[in-house]
Amino acid sequence: MTIKHDDWLLEQLKDAEFAAEFLNAANEDDDPKTYLTALRKVVEARGGMALVAEKAHLSRETLYRTLSSARGNPTIKTLNAVLKATGLKFGVSAQ
């Protein structure tokens, strides 16, 4: 049986540890667009835009705009809310 990459990825991202590592890897790229694209995938896998927006106390439109790789420039407060809504949190480590 063949499975599409996106389907496989979305299934894997349902696991919190995998999702955290996925976001950490995306954060290694110096381009914030990479992180926003990865976070968008995590949101999709862990409930979808509507549910995550509701849990984060954001409108769906605001969440879409926030995670837009073209225009997105989320605040720390918004990123924290989105991560919390997906069951994740920020972390910092030494280089």
Which sequence ranges carry the predicted segments?
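N-terminal flexible/basic segments that precede or flank functional cores
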Residues: 1-41
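Short, solvent-exposed alpha-helical "recognition" segments
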Residues: 70-76
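Short alpha-helical DNA-recognition segment
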Residues: 45-65
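Conserved interaction-surface patches within small, structured recognition/assembly domains
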Residues: 40-41, 65-69
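DNA major-groove recognition helix of helix-turn-helix/homeodomain DNA-binding modules
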Residues: 76-92
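Long, contiguous binding/interaction regions
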Residues: 57, 81, 95
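Membrane-interface junctions
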Residues: 28-29, 45, 69
